[in-house]
């Protein structure tokens, strides 16, 4: 089947939720990069390259006039992604995707994104982190924010509770976690914030 549209008002709400999610993910990722910059300033350059990634730009467009008093048309405008689309991390498990196999360069990006999840988890004191990382080149899109039991679908429909609950046991610290001296993951009440 082809692409399907939701009823107009439901689609507008979905667009608003998607734009808010991208705003939150961009902000959370900037916080992780601020941590990285501060640590590099303190320790010097790491012995490996830091990928320069960002979430694509997105906006909600709304038509000025409506087709009826109860219906407002809205559209989501996204930056174009060029190149092959890659799924780096699924929102159910905090490890690099293995199907289809990632190239060496894609695996390095996935490993870095696993590290950013660790940073985000510590920065939020065990409350949240970005997952479902995917995109192409240095652009990321269509993420999810996994949270503790703060609320059902607080940031979107992809908040996989089981994925969040498994994070501290399934995350495997890598060269980034070690070089940036991240505290090991423990129960959220004992995890030190960055």
Q: At which residue positions do the language-model features occur?
A:
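Catalytic-loop of the protein kinase fold
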Residues: 111-113, 117-148
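Conserved structural core of kinase catalytic domains
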Residues: 1-110, 140-194
């Amino acid at each position: 089947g082809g692409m399907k549209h939701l009823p107009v008002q439901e689609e507008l709400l979905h667009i608003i939720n998607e734009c808010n999610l991208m705003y939150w993910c961009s902000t959370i990722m900037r916080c992780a990069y601020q941590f990285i910059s501060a640590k590099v300033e303190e320790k010097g350059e790491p012995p490996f390259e830091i990928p320069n990634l960002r979430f694509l730009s997105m906006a909600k467009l709304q038509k000025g006039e409506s087709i009826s008093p109860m219906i407002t048309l809205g559209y989501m405008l996204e930056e174009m992604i060029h190149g092959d689309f890659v799924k780096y991390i699924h929102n159910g498990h905090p490890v690099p995707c293995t199907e289809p196999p990632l190239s060496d360069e894609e695996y390095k990006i996935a490993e870095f994104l696993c590290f950013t999840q660790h940073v985000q988890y510590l920065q939020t004191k065990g409350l949240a982190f970005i997952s479902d990382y995917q995109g192409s080149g240095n652009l990321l899109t269509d993420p999810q924010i996994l949270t503790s039991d703060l609320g059902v679908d607080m940031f979107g429909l992809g908040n996989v509770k089981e994925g969040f609950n498994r994070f501290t046991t399934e995350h495997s610290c890598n060269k980034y976690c070690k070089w940036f001296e991240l505290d090991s993951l423990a129960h959220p009440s004992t995890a030190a914030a960055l």
